[in-house]
Amino acid sequence: MLLGVLAAGPSAAALSAEEAAGRRLYETGIGVSGEAPQARVGSGGLALPASALPCANCHGRDGRGRPEGGVTPPDIRWSELIKPYGHVHENRRRHGPFDADGFRIAVGDGLDPAGNRLDQAMPRYLFGARDLDNLRAYLRHLEKRAARGVGDMHVQIGTLLPLRGPLADAGKAVRGMLEAYFARVNAAGGIYGRRLELVVAEYANDAERSVDNLGHALDDGDGVFALLSPFAAGFERRLTDLAKARDLPVVAPVVLVPDNRPAANSHVFHLLSGGTELARVLADYARATLELDNRDIVLVQSAGSAWDGAAQDVSAHLERGGDGSPGRTLFRRGLTDLDGMAAKLEADGAKAVILLGGDLDPAVFAAAAARNDWYPELLVPGPFASQDVMALPPGFDGKVFVAYPSLPTDRDKATWQDYLALLAEAGIDRAPHATLVASYAGAELLVEALKRAGRELSREAMVLGLEKIQGFESGLLPPLTYNTTRRVGALGGYVVAVDLAKRVYRPIGPWRSLD
């Protein structure tokens, strides 16, 4: 399965005190004093508070201006105002570049640098010197917020996919499916008249090359507005940092390696639960259905700080719901004596084992346990369940449980047929369905978020739109819900039993939510 996280875009540094005050003035009309300065409107000079007529109302939160009601407010980002060759407006009004003094006169007296009167729709604001300085500082900052990859007629969406090597078939299938999906959206008029365009960066086995390839996609030409279904196996944490630093939203399937740093994933919206969340689902199952005490459960975790944090998260989850703490054992590939580990766990009275991390194959662990004639309940998050899980020693029959973030039963019949038709349109006859289903659902979520962000598209509006999504039905996955702190849409999973005799999975009960 293609697993991913991430994003990118120009850096949006934290606001300075002056920029923050300028933003408040620009968006709300409230000055440095905490009150609204006065504004005069129209030929009669009607006096109103600036809070009734903030700059953003006409020029937009991004400063670019949008035609409305027969009036076309200009782009007032500072780099536009100071263009050395000046400006020629639609009504043929001409003037040279603004400077600080010219800006003051335009805002307060309604005159451009050539002495021409501005449109009467433009209020004349009675701002003090500090308010003017703060406003000018924020207009400079708007350049940093400008959304790359967005034009009047297009939005460029990036992805990172393997196009060569053993994963090439999966990567090419995702690319073909996304291109076909975007073509459908565009044929229906796009999003607020903008066409969706896919920009593909090539994932390489080498992390440095992959990051470099992604950087070119983000920075070359128009760049990209957001990332969709990126493949980031092996360097998720680094790409998550890139996403946050560049202030760009990302819609990703599922993260394999957890990132336990506070607010690390502020811009990454995962569709499905990963290994840590699914381990919590299994922990609940062990306690509620298998009726085990916390002390009966042992977490066998892979080595590494990410898995230390994951084990702490699962332990804390168990402790909130019951008495005592589960056991924890560290597995180091090539160093740990599994037979000795199994013997000690049995001697300690462990009745259930939750595997946490991809270093330890469940079949290898089960073989070591069987050599000790020990058959505990074996609980495996889906991302860590190898194909050999069906071939465990017979003593484990009825004792192996796997948690998955979604099942085929989540698929609405009509949506599934529509999805299959899209694959046919794209010429995809062999496909890793789990990967493509997640990418298709991600594209549906992306389009919904773009619609919610509105015509004045910005990364900030996109993130806010995603955070407000509640119970979104893609038709192929469990409902997706986000908020200001939640970055996993379908937070929970299904538990399935492994029938070793018949070599099949048997779902046990409904979706298990972690809300």
Locate each region found by the language model.
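C-terminal capping alpha-helices of c-type cytochrome domains
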Residues: 15-21, 98-113, 120-148
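Gly/Gly-Pro-rich "capping" loops immediately C-terminal to redox-active cysteine motifs
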Residues: 38-100, 121-127
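Extracytoplasmic ligand/sensor domains, especially the bilobed periplasmic-binding protein
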Residues: 224-327, 377-401
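Extracellular/periplasmic ligand-binding modules, especially the Venus flytrap/periplasmic-binding
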Residues: 313, 359-362, 408-468
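Solvent-exposed, acidic/polar segments of extracytosolic/periplasmic ligand-binding ectodomains
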Residues: 470-515
